C-alpha cells in the first residue's frame, strides 16, 4: 500500500482543491480565507497550486478517474471495493488508520482510489482478452513451466542467507530440516507448489525454480518486498517437476490467465488502453497550465494515431502540390532505392 499511498496522496491533494473549486463554482472570487487587509479566494488558491508537480499528477489521475467511471462504472461493484479495502486494512493491522492519516486519506477517499484502480484494471483485462491469438498462446507455451513442487527458505538478510546456502551445500545436508529450522515464514512453512505463471510468489523466485532440474538448489535470490520495502532472501530446491505436455492447448486456460496477467502488468499496454479511453471521451484541456498532462498518451490511442497519420498524409499531399518537381524527384529516388521496410523484407531472401 505504500506505493499506493504516494499516488493516492497526490490525487487527494488536487482532488481537495478541485472539490473546493466545484463547491464554489458560482463565483471563483468567493473568499476562503480572510485576514487584515487581504483575502484569499478560490481562484487565488487554484492559481497558486495548479502549476505544481503534485497538482499536475493529481489532475491526470482525476481525469483518468472520471473517464473510466463514465465508460466502465457499472463493471466494478461496491462489494469488490469493500473487499479490497478490508484486505489492505488486514495487511496493515493496527497501523492502518495511521497509514491512512499519514497519506491525508480517509476510508472513503481511499475507497474511491481503489475503485478508480479497479476500473482501469477491468479495462486493461478486457483489452488483453482481445490479444489472445494462437500466436500469443504458442509464445506463452514456449516459456511455460508446469507445476513444480519446491521447498523454499525465506531469510531476512544476505549474510545469513549465504551462510545457510553453504550449510545446504555440505555433504549429506538435509534441505528440509535446515529449511524448517532457518526459514522466517509464519508457521515455518517451506513446501510450495506453483507453475511459471504464479503471481503469489516473487517473480525472481519463480524464474529460478523454473530453470532448475529436479533436485536442483538455487543460489541466494534477493527480492525487494513491495509492501515493506525491505529485502527478502530466498533459497529454493525443486523436489518435483510435472512433465510438460507437447500440445499447448492442454494448458489453454492457464496460458490465457498468464497472458492476461502479463499484459495487465505491461505499462505500455496499460497506457494504450488509457489512451483509447481518453480518445473515446474526447478529453480537451481548457487550462493551459495542464496542457501537457496527457503527453505520455499522445499517439497511443487509435483515434489519435489515425488523426496523426491523416495529418501526415495531408501535409505530404500539400507539399507535393506546392513542389511537384521535388515530389517527382522523391518518387524517382524511392523507386531506385528500397525503403527500410522493403530492405528488411528482402534480406531473408538473400540469405
Curated annotation (Swiss-Prot):
EC top class, as a word: isomerase
Signal peptide interval: 1-22
Catalytic activity: [protein]-peptidylproline (omega=180) = [protein]-peptidylproline (omega=0)
A GO cellular component annotation in the UniProt record: plasma membrane
Gene Ontology MF annotations: peptidyl-prolyl cis-trans isomerase activity
Compositionally biased tracts (Low complexity): 303-317, 326-351
Main location as per UniProt: membrane
Lipid moiety-binding region (N-palmitoyl cysteine): 23
Protein location: Cell membrane
Pfam families in UniProt: Rotamase_2 (PF13145)
Positions where lipid (S-diacylglycerol cysteine) attaches: 23
Membrane topology classification: Lipid-anchor
Keywords carried by this UniProt record: Cell membrane, Isomerase, Lipoprotein, Membrane, Palmitate, Rotamase, Signal
Enzyme Commission code: 5.2.1.8
GO biological process: protein folding
Region (Disordered): 303-351
Entries under SUPFAM superfamilies matching the protein: FKBP-like (SSF54534), Triger factor/SurA peptide-binding domain-like (SSF109998)
Every PpiC domain range: 145-240
Family (UniProt): Belongs to the PrsA family.
Function: Plays a major role in protein secretion by helping the post-translocational extracellular folding of several secreted proteins.
Name of the protein: Foldase protein PrsA 1
Amino acid at each position: 500500500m505504500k506505493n499506493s499511498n504516494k499516488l493516492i496522496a497526490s490525487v487527494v491533494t488536487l482532488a481537495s482543491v478541485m472539490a473546493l473549486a466545484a463547491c464554489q463554482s458560482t463565483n471563483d472570487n468567493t473568499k476562503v480565507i480572510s485576514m487584515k487587509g487581504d483575502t484569499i479566494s478560490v481562484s487565488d488558491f487554484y492559481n497558486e497550486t495548479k502549476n505544481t508537480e503534485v497538482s499536475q499528477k493529481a489532475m491526470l489521475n482525476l481525469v483518468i478517474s472520471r473517464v473510466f467511471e463514465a465508460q466502465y462504472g457499472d463493471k466494478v461493484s461496491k462489494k469488490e471495493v469493500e473487499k479490497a479495502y478490508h484486505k489492505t486494512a488486514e495487511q496493515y493491522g493496527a497501523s492502518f488508520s495511521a497509514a491512512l492519516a499519514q497519506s491525508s486519506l480517509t476510508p472513503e477517499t481511499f475507497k474511491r482510489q481503489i475503485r478508480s484502480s479497479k476500473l482501469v484494471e477491468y479495462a486493461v483485462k478486457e483489452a488483453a482478452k482481445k490479444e489472445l491469438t494462437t500466436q500469443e498462446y504458442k509464445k506463452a507455451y514456449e516459456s511455460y513451466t508446469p507445476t513444480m513442487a519446491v521447498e523454499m527458505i525465506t531469510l531476512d538478510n544476505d549474510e545469513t542467507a549465504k551462510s545457510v546456502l553453504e550449510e545446504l551445500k555440505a555433504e549429506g545436508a538435509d534441505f528440509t530440516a535446515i529449511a524448517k529450522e532457518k526459514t522466517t515464514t509464519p508457521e515455518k512453512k517451506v513446501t510450495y507448489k506453483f507453475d511459471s505463471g504464479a503471481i503469489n510468489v516473487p517473480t525472481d523466485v519463480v524464474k529460478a525454480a523454473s530453470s532448475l532440474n529436479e533436485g536442483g538448489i538455487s543460489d541466494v535470490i534477493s527480492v525487494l518486498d513491495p509492501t515493506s520495502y525491505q529485502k527478502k532472501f530466498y533459497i529454493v530446491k525443486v523436489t518435483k517437476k510435472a512433465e510438460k505436455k507437447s500440445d499447448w492447448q492442454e494448458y489453454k486456460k492457464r496460458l490465457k490467465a498468464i497472458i492476461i496477467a502479463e499484459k495487465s502488468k505491461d505499462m505500455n499496454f496499460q497506457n494504450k488502453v488509457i489512451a483509447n479511453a481518453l480518445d473515446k471521451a474526447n478529453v480537451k484541456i481548457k487550462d493551459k497550465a495542464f496542457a501537457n498532462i496527457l503527453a505520455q498518451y499522445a499517439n497511443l490511442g487509435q483515434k489519435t494515431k489515425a488523426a496523426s497519420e491523416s495529418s501526415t498524409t495531408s501535409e505530404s499531399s500539400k507539399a507535393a502540390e506546392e513542389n511537384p518537381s521535388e515530389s517527382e524527384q522523391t518518387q524517382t529516388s524511392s523507386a531506385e532505392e528500397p525503403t527500410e521496410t522493403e530492405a528488411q523484407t528482402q534480406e531473408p531472401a538473400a540469405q
